[in-house]
């Protein structure tokens, strides 16, 4: 696994996590 694919995996994980936090915040947890 090279550094670029690893970076993309981390970026997608952070994006999905932040998106889930926004949805949870809108629903009032």
UniProtKB/Swiss-Prot annotation:
Q: Which domain of life is it from?
A: Eukaryota
Please give the chief subcellular localization of this protein: plastid
What's an example GO BP annotation here? cytochrome complex assembly
Which subcellular locations apply to this protein? Plastid, Chloroplast thylakoid membrane
Q: Identify its membrane topology class.
A: Single-pass membrane protein
The UniProt keywords, alphabetically, are: Chloroplast, Electron transport, Membrane, Photosynthesis, Plastid, Thylakoid, Transmembrane, Transmembrane helix, Transport
- Record's GO cellular component, any one? cytochrome b6f complex
Q: Which GO terms describe its molecular function?
A: electron transporter, transferring electrons within cytochrome b6/f complex of photosystem II activity
Q: Name one Pfam family in it.
A: PetN
Which regions span the lipid bilayer? 3-23
Functionally, this protein is described as follows:
Component of the cytochrome b6-f complex, which mediates electron transfer between photosystem II (PSII) and photosystem I (PSI), cyclic electron flow around PSI, and state transitions.
Q: Which family does it belong to?
A: Belongs to the PetN family.
User: Could you give the subunit structure recorded for this chain?
Assistant: The 4 large subunits of the cytochrome b6-f complex are cytochrome b6, subunit IV (17 kDa polypeptide, PetD), cytochrome f and the Rieske protein, while the 4 small subunits are PetG, PetL, PetM and PetN. The complex functions as a dimer.
Q: What is this protein called?
A: Cytochrome b6-f complex subunit 8
- Protein source organism: Trieres chinensis
Taxonomic lineage per UniProt?
A: Eukaryota, Sar, Stramenopiles, Ochrophyta, Bacillariophyta
